[in-house]
Amino acid sequence: MAEHDFETISSETLHTGAIFALRRDQVRMPGGGIVTREVVEHFGAVAIVAMDDNGNIPMVYQYRHTYGRRLWELPAGLLDVAGEPPHLTAARELREEVGLQASTWQVLVDLDTAPGFSDESVRVYLATGLREVGRPEAHHEEADMTMGWYPIAEAARRVLRGEIVNSIAIAGVLAVHAVTTGFAQPRPLDTEWIDRPTAFAARRAER
């Protein structure tokens, strides 16, 4: 039996903002019915697990207005610079947020953060061969941001204690724990990113 083609019959833009857009699609379901699906379009993002020679990783403590509190997270950033390859975005964010540069980059894990309503996808990189390069002047929430170094095993325990709740950080921490314990291997830097978002970046480029 052939798979059903979920055809989009029509699409309406409800909102276009600085970092996301909201659209309403009419989609044909199996059996012929038409249903409404609302989709948040997103730039997509990258995050970095930067591991030093002793198996420690830096995490940032950043205020998130959505929750009204600070969360422990990985260095990360949006893919909001047109034409910038994702791994170079990751390298820039690593330098800007924690003042580090890495000589080796690999793909650790990709995650679709909210597939029920958003096309946001995040690629988490493993960065090694670290050296300090200094952090540039920060602005907005990042000016308040602090950093801490954690052994990978301790970071994994903090996930399971509920002290790290950011989903991207959880995925990255548990993935690097799997790598360092021999359970899995990271992937090459040029690994295809199947779900990398493109709709919102294209929409912004047209403005």
From Swiss-Prot:
One of its GO terms (biological process) is DNA replication. Mg(2+) 3 binds at residues 93, 97, 142. GO terms for cellular component: cytosol. Keywords: DNA damage, DNA repair, DNA replication, Hydrolase, Magnesium, Manganese, Metal-binding. InterPro entries: NUDIX_hydrolase-like_dom_sf (IPR015797), NUDIX_hydrolase_dom (IPR000086). Changing residue 64 to A: 3-fold decrease in KM for ADPR. 910-fold decrease in kcat with ADPR as substrate. It is an enzyme of class 3 (hydrolase). Binds 3 Mg(2+) ions per subunit. Activity is highest with Mn(2+). Can also use Zn(2+) or Co(2+), with lower efficiency. Signal peptide: none annotated. It catalyses: ADP-D-ribose + H2O = D-ribose 5-phosphate + AMP + 2 H(+); 8-oxo-dGDP + H2O = 8-oxo-dGMP + phosphate + H(+); 8-oxo-GDP + H2O = 8-oxo-GMP + phosphate + H(+). Its EC number is 3.6.1.13, 3.6.1.58. Optimum pH is 8.0. Its cofactor is Mg(2+); Mn(2+). Mg(2+) 2 binds at residue 93. PANTHER family: ADP-RIBOSE PYROPHOSPHATASE, UDP/ADP-SUGAR PYROPHOSPHATASE. Belongs to the Nudix hydrolase family. Catalyzes the hydrolysis of ADP-ribose (ADPR) to AMP and ribose-5-phosphate. Can also hydrolyze ADP-mannose and ADP-glucose, with lower efficiency. Has weaker activity with NAD, GDP-sugars and UDP-sugars. Also catalyzes the conversion of 8-oxo-dGDP to 8-oxo-dGMP, and 8-oxo-GDP to 8-oxo-GMP. Functions in concert with MutT1 to detoxify 8-oxo-dGTP to 8-oxo-dGMP and may play an important role in supporting cellular growth under oxidative stress. The catalytic efficiency is much higher for the hydrolysis of ADPR than 8-oxo-dGTP, suggesting a more relevant biological role in hydrolysis of ADPR. This is ADP-ribose pyrophosphatase. It comes from Mycobacterium tuberculosis (strain ATCC 25618 / H37Rv).
